[in-house]
Amino acid sequence: MEILRIEPTPSPNTMKVVLSYTREDKLSNTYKKVEETQPEFINQLLSIDGITSIFHVMNFLAVDKSPKADWEVILPDIKAAFSDANKVLESVNEPQIDNHFGEIKAELLTFKGIPYQIKLTSADQELREQLPQTYVDQMTQAQTAHDNIVFMRKWLDLGNRYGNIEEVMDGVLEEVLATYPESQLPVLVKHALEENHATNNYHFYRHVSLDEYHATDNWKTRLRTLNHFPKPTFEDIPLLDLALSDEKVPVRRQAIVLLGMIESKEILPYLYKGLRDKSPAVRRTAGDCISDLGYPEALPEMVLLLDDPQKIVRWRAAMFIFDEGNAEQLPALKAHINDNAFEVKLQIEMAISRIENGDEALGSVWKQMANRTI
C-alpha cells in the first residue's frame, strides 16, 4: 500500500491521504488511539506526534492533527510510515506554516440565554474574556437553588473570524455588547426565571422592513437587528444590500452571512460585493458563503481573489477552484503556483493536479466526513 497523493481539505487541521489500496468492505472507521486490534499502519500514524485521529473510508484517510501541530512537520512522518524514509522524505523548501492561518472560532458562554464570557480559538491559542461585571451579576440573579450551572451553561457558536486574535476579541466583544445591551438583561433574567424555561436559550427573532432599518442611526441597533433577523428571503435582499454599505465591519459581515442563507444564484452579485470589501474578514466570509453554495458561475470572481493581499482569502479562492474549477482556471492557478503561504501554495498545487488529472471534486465525501461519528 502506497500514498498516491496528499490533499488539503476545507479544515486547516485535516489532510486527505489518498492510498493505492481500496477497502473491499465498503465500511468506514475512526481511530483515535493505538490499539492492538487495529491495522499496523493506522497505529504507526497515530504514534506520530500531533496526530489526533484518523478516519478511513474507501481509498483514503482523513488525518486530523492538533491545532498546535504543523503539517510541515507531520507530512514527512506520514509519508515515512508508508515506505522507506530515504525514498519518501523530500527536501521541502516551502515557507514555514503560519500558525495564525485560517479561522478563529468565536464562541459565547451563556447561562439560560444570558451571556457572560467570550472564547476565541485559533490554530495555536485560546483566548477568553469575561463580559462586564453587570452581565455576570445578571447571570447570577437568573440562578435558582435547583440549577445545575455546569450542565445548563451553553457555548453559542458565533461563527469564524479572521485576523489578529487580540483584535478579533475586541471586535467580538463590541458585537456581543451591541447584540445583548445592558438594557435587555432584565428581560433575559425574567425569562430565565419563568417556569419551564430553565434550560432554554432565549432568542429575539424579529423581521424589520427596509424603511425601518434605513431609519436606524445607531450601528449597534443595526447589528442587533441583523443578529436577530429570521432566515431571510428574496424580499429581504434590498435591506441586506443596504447593510453591505454600512460603515461598520460587523454589520457588513452579518449581512453577508444572511445573504448566504438565501440559497440561490440570484444572490451571487451581492456576495461578489463582499469579495471586494475593504475588510479581509468580510471578503473571506463572502468566499466561505460562495464555497458553501458551490455555484461554478462564481469561478471568475474567485479567481480574482488569488491576488488578494490576505492569505486567508487566497486560500479560500484556491479551495473553491479545487472544488469547482476546470481547465479554464489552469493558467491563473499556474501563475500563482509560487504563493508564499504554505497552505495556499499546497491548495493551488492540488487544484492543478485535480484538474489536469480529470478527477472529480469530492463534495459528497466531505459531507460524509463531516457527518462521521467520532
UniProtKB/Swiss-Prot annotation:
Disulfide bonds: none
InterPro entries, A to Z: ARM-like, ARM-type_fold, Nfu/NifU_N, Nfu/NifU_N_sf, PBS_lyase_HEAT, Virulence_F_dom
The keyword Metal-binding is assigned to this record: no
Keyword Cell inner membrane in record: no
GO MF assignments: oxidoreductase activity
Keywords noted in UniProt: Virulence
Domain of life: Bacteria
Similarity remark: Belongs to the CvfC family.
Role summary: Required for hemolysin production.
Protein name (database record): Conserved virulence factor C
Lineage: Bacteria, Bacillati, Bacillota, Bacilli, Bacillales
Gene: cvfC
